[in-house]
Amino acid sequence: KEGYPVDWGNCKYECMSDAYCKDLCADRKAKSGYCYKLNWSCYCEGLPDDSPIKTNGHCRPGGRRK
């Protein structure tokens, strides 16, 4: 699957570079990843089906963990 990976607080990962997102997505077993610069968030492609991605729901910033 593909989408914006989220942390424990259901928050997307902010980015400024593709390299950061590529590493973040690789850590989550995705095939590729990049920084989607229209909203400055990491986007992953080829994620495992059980990987959490952004859906409807609020970001709870206190839950940030990598």
From Swiss-Prot:
Q: What does this chain do? A: Alpha toxins bind voltage-independently at site-3 of sodium channels (Nav) and inhibit the inactivation of the activated channels, thereby blocking neuronal transmission.
Q: Which GO terms describe its molecular function?
A: sodium channel inhibitor activity; toxin activity
Q: Which family does it belong to?
A: Belongs to the long (4 C-C) scorpion toxin superfamily. Sodium channel inhibitor family. Alpha subfamily.
- Recorded superkingdom: Eukaryota
| PROSITE patterns assigned | LCN_CSAB (PS51863)
Q: Which residues cross the membrane?
A: none
Per the record, what is one GO cellular component?
Answer: extracellular region
Domain LCN-type CS-alpha/beta, by residue range, is: 1-60
Q: Which SMART domains match?
A: Knot1
| Organism encoding this protein | Rhopalurus junceus (Caribbean blue scorpion)
Tissue specificity, in the record's words, reads: Expressed by the venom gland.
Which pairs are disulfide-linked? Answer: 11-59, 15-35, 21-42, 25-44
**Where is the protein found, in the record's own terms?**
Secreted
Swiss-Prot/TrEMBL keywords: Disulfide bond, Ion channel impairing toxin, Neurotoxin, Secreted, Toxin, Voltage-gated sodium channel impairing toxin
Lineage, highest ranks first? Eukaryota, Metazoa, Ecdysozoa, Arthropoda, Chelicerata
Query: Where primarily located?
Result: secreted
Picking any one GO biological process from the record gives: defense response
Spell out the SUPFAM superfamilies in the cross-references: Scorpion toxin-like
Could you identify this protein by its name? Answer: Putative alpha-neurotoxin RjAa44
